Regions:
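Accessory interaction regions appended to the cores of large information-processing enzymes
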Residues: 1-325
Length: 325
C-alpha cells in the first residue's frame, strides 16, 4: 500500500515507496489520470524519535485573562508501541473535565522530537498535575499548556542526552550465486547489517522459509537485517554483479536506534527552539502583562509543585475515561 503524508513543517507531500519501479508507476498514473507532470525529489529516510529515560515537562500559558498549567511525564515505551496517553492526576487536584481536555489536546497533535523534528514514537505521556483558574481558563489555554509541556519534557531530555533517534530496518533475504556470496556478505557487513550463517545447496523446505538460510542450483541464501538508509539502490547493484541471477527481498522489520545518529542530526540542522509552532517555552503573567519564560527556567516559575504522594494509579486515556466512567 502506498503511504502518503503531508509535512506541515516542510510544506511537502511525502510518499512511502518500495523502489524506482513503483515511483514510475505513480508518475504515470498522475500523468494519465490527471494530466500532471510531477517531479520527485530524492528519497529520504523516515526517521523517528523517542526517549531513553522518563522526563517531566511543564507547560504554563497565562497571557492576560487566560490561565492553564499542565505537568506531563513523557517516558519510553516498548518498541513499536507508538504514543500512549494516560493520567495519574487526582481529581481532587484537577477536575476530570480539565483532565479530559488536556489529554484530548495531547492526543490530537502529531508530536515531533527535538533532534531532527522527526515524529515522536514509542513513548507514554501521562498527565501528573495541572491547574485551572475558575474565571480565566478557556479550552484553548490548556491546548497551549499541553503542547508546551510535552515539548519542555523533550528539551529537558535532550539536555541530558536522553533523546534517541530511530531509523527503519529491513529484514532481507539475498539470493546470489555461490561464487558471489563473499561479495554479498561483505556488502551487508559494510552497511552495518547483521545476518546468520549463509546456506547453499538444495532449496529450503517451506518450513524453513524466513529462517535465514537455504539455496538451490548453486544459489546461496543470506538472510538478516540491515538499516534502510544503507540500502539505496542495492537491488540494482545485486542484479549487476550477479548478472541478473541475484534477488533481494525486503520487509520492514521495525525501528531501531540510528547507527549514525550524529551524522543525521548534523545534516538535519534542526533547531527545536526556532520551531515556533512547537515551542517549549511558557507564558506567565506579571503586573497585567504576559511574558515568555524559556523552557530551562519554567520549573522555577511553575505554580504547581510535583508531589508524588498525590499521584493515583495510571489510567489510560481510553473510551471509558472520556465517556465518564
Amino acid at each position: 500500500m502506498l503511504g502518503v503524508a503531508w509535512s506541515e513543517r516542510l510544506q511537502e507531500i511525502h510518499l512511502q515507496l518500495m523502489g524506482a519501479v513503483q515511483l514510475e508507476v505513480v508518475r504515470g498514473l498522475l500523468s494519465d489520470r490527471y494530466g500532471l507532470s510531477v517531479d520527485f525529489g530524492s528519497a529520504g529516510i523516515l526517521y523517528k524519535e523517542t526517549l531513553s529515560a522518563p522526563s517531566m515537562g511543564i507547560g504554563h500559558f497565562e497571557p492576560l485573562r487566560h490561565y492553564a498549567e499542565a505537568h506531563l511525564l513523557v517516558e519510553p515505551g516498548p518498541r513499536g508501541s507508538g504514543v500512549v496517553f494516560g493520567t495519574r492526576c487526582s481529581e481532587d487536584e484537577l477536575d476530570r473535565n480539565w483532565q479530559r481536555l488536556i489529554l484530548a489536546n495531547a492526543m490530537e497533535r502529531d508530536h515531533v522530537g527535538v533532534l531532527t523534528g522527526a515524529p515522536l514514537t514509542d513513548v507514554r505521556i501521562t498527565l501528573c498535575a495541572g491547574r485551572a483558574h475558575a474565571k480565566h481558563t478557556e479550552g484553548g489555554d490548556f491546548r497551549q499548556a499541553t503542547y508546551r509541556a510535552v515539548r519542555q519534557a523533550l528539551m529537558c531530555a535532550r539536555s541530558r542526552g536522553e533523546c534517541v533517534l530511530l531509523e527503519p530496518w529491513y529484514a532481507f533475504e539475498l539470493e546470489v550465486p555461490e561464487d558471489k556470496l563473499g561479495r554479498a556478505m561483505s556488502d551487508m557487513t559494510r552497511m552495518g547489517g547483521r545476518f546468520g550463517a549463509p546456506s547453499a545447496g538444495a532449496a529450503p523446505a517451506a518450513s524453513d522459509a524466513g529462517a535465514g538460510a537455504g539455496a538451490s542450483g548453486g544459489i546461496a541464501t543470506l538472510a538478516g537485517e540491515v538499516p534502510a538508509s544503507e540500502l539505496g539502490d542495492y537491488a540494482l547493484e545485486v542484479a549487476a554483479y550477479t548478472g541478473g541471477r541475484g534477488r533481494l527481498s525486503l520487509q520492514l522489520a521495525g525501528y531501531e536506534p540510528c547507527h549514525d545518529a550524529d551524522r543525521v542530526i548534523e545534516e538535519a540542522a534542526y533547531d527545536p527552539e526556532a520551531d515556533l509552532p512547537n515551542t517549549p517555552d511558557s507564558v506567565f503573567c506579571s503586573h497585567g502583562a504576559g511574558y515568555t519564560v524559556k523552557w530551562q527556567e519554567v520549573p522555577a516559575h511553575a505554580h504547581v509543585a510535583d508531589d508524588p504522594s498525590l499521584l493515583r494509579p495510571w489510567r489510560p486515556a481510553d473510551a471509558a475515561f472520556f465517556g465518564g466512567e
